[in-house]
Every structure is written in C-alpha cells, then in structure tokens.
C-alpha cells in the first residue's frame, strides 16, 4: 500500500482544523441565536440552552446538504441572522407533493437527490459530461439517499438506494412499464420520486434537497477543492477521472465531479490497470469519501470570504423543497453543531442482481435483509408500503415482518466488502450488495486526507 494512504490514516487519527480557535465563542453565539429563534416561534416557551448528545460511532458521510447547513451555520455565527436569511432566500425552492410535515423534536427524513442534469454547465465541462453548451442532457436521479435525523438521540443515519433498484412505478407505466429502476422516476421532478420511495418502502419523506452536476462542481470550487488520498494512479474513461499520480492531492472542478460519478473506476497496481466491477456500489463509497472530505474542508474554513463565495454559489445547482425553512436549518445546526461527521452511520439497501428483459442488469431488494435494515433505521416511523417493490419473479409481496433490534450497528454498510473486485467483471453489470458485517473501505479507493 502506498505511503500516502498510511500517512493519511495516521493523520485522520487526531486532526485539528484551523477553526479550533474561537470555537467556544462561536458555540455560545450559536446557542444564543437558536434560543432567540425558538423563542420567536414559541414566545410562551422558556428559553433553554441546547444540549448536544454524542452519537454512536459510524463510518462515512455522504451528504452535500450537510455542507449547505454548515455554510449557513457559519454565516449565522459570523454575519448574523438577516444575512443568512437573505442568502437562504437565494436558494431555489420546489414544491414537493407527498411530503409529511416535520414534527418538532421528532425524527425526520431528508430525501437527497443527485441529478445527472447538466443544467448550468458550459464549455469544456459541458462537453466532458456529454452535454453541449446550448442543451441540458440527462434528468435522472443517479444518487438517491435518505438522511434520517433523530434530534432526541443526536444521531444521523444515511441510507443509499442504488440507482438500478427495481420499484413499482406510480406513474408513467405506459412509458416505463409497471416495474422499472428507481432512477426513472425523477424525470417528472422530486414529488414522484418521494412518493415512490414512500409507497415502495414505507419511508416517510419530510424534506428534499437536489444537487446537479453544476451544484457539486460549484461547491467544490467555492471551497478551493477537497483533499483526497489516492493510494494508486486512477482513472475512469466514462466519468473523465484522471489521477496520474498517487498520494494526497487537491481535487476540484471537473475532477471533483468525475470522482463522485465514477462507476467504472480503475487503479494502476503492479504494472496492471485493475477494474472495480462493483459499479454503483463502488460509486456510492467514492461519493461518501468525497463528500466527507468536502465537509471536513468546509469545517476548516472559517473564512468569511470563502464561506460567502460558497453561499453565493449554492443557488447554482442546488434546490430545496419549499417547506424547508431557515428556522428548521438553524434548529438542526444548533442541535448538531458539534457533531463529528465520522460518527454518521451510512448504509446501502441490501439487493440481489438479476437480468430482466430489455432492462438488462437490475437489482431487487433482498428480503428479509432489506426490511430488517429499514426497521432498524426508521423504527416506528416506518409506514406500511402501499405499492411494494417487486421481487425477482416480478411479484409484489408485502415486506416480511421483522423485529426491531437494539441498535442499528448490527447491520453494517452493505457496500463494505468491495475489495473483491476484479478487472474481469462486465463493465455495465449490476452487482449484488455485499452483506459482510465488517465494513472495510476497499484498499484501492481514495479517502479524505490532510496535505
């Protein structure tokens, strides 16, 4: 293994950012702001200091909305409520039908959609992603994640649903059939995707955040790039990834997008280009690593100019549901301002591969493992599916009844045993999600690092 990976691992053990200075003062100001906002909304309630609990230890983070929350949080601390309110008003909003109201103090779920829309891309970047300068190509949800936030427990959990997962469609069946991949639902906007997730899996959706190609690129550029340690030279001819040298290096612009999009990842080891055949599962892991690095980078930049640049670029490629209020973001920030990203739990829906007619290689929810994971994550808030996903026989049985376990850590990330990938796997094949309870990041994948 490359020395860079060893050094990065050693550095991750005990790292302090430049933001350590003044942290206590910032926290006091943040708590005071949160109390003021809460009192404004509920003047009859006494103002009490926010208590932050430690969460269970997790593995990786995969959520660009955390970066948005963090940036707004820093703006609040450094620039005041009115400035953050103005910046928040600049973020595009979309009406989402089917959302359930968020109840104060109760767990809630944020649907995170990574769209393959090329809107906002121009010139070389547009051509590299397959779009011309005058057209917008693609409108599918290549990233589908549900962020489960439990304010009382102080925990955050991320569930990823692979894009090839088969679901029962609620609309457009004449065009796509009764059953199809989950990512075809996004062409009509986030409402249909949110409703499909609830109908198929019983997961209630309270909020939505969408991120396009331009949104991810702009966020990385505004932060001055993120640092990732590549243990080997790497490339992906499909996404455009090109890392000629190993080691900890700054990734920004188009290469940042290329890392997050990489499904055909190759690494150069012992004179041979090796191929990661795990497809979407590999991409999920690399997205998690990239976004964890992005959040670490954002947390280290308590620079008003940098944060202002980041906030100014948020409207270019990021959209929130119209019901997501600034006060809710502030409450979220007050509760989780000391939350360590490494303590976030991440999971991938257990699936099994199959080939279905013209659809080719797809994935089906693996039962009872999938239902067990959903129950463990969402608990009593999980609803009974009205349109369950199909099994490999294209039948739609109700999910099995399973018991809630004492802790969600009993089921590890299902994208955790990818180190068995070989260069002989068919490029476009859907791959079964591993179920090894020991979550280990593949040795060839990039990880966050400190230069």
Model-derived regions: residue spans:
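Non-catalytic, solvent-exposed segments at the cell envelope interface
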Residues: 2-451
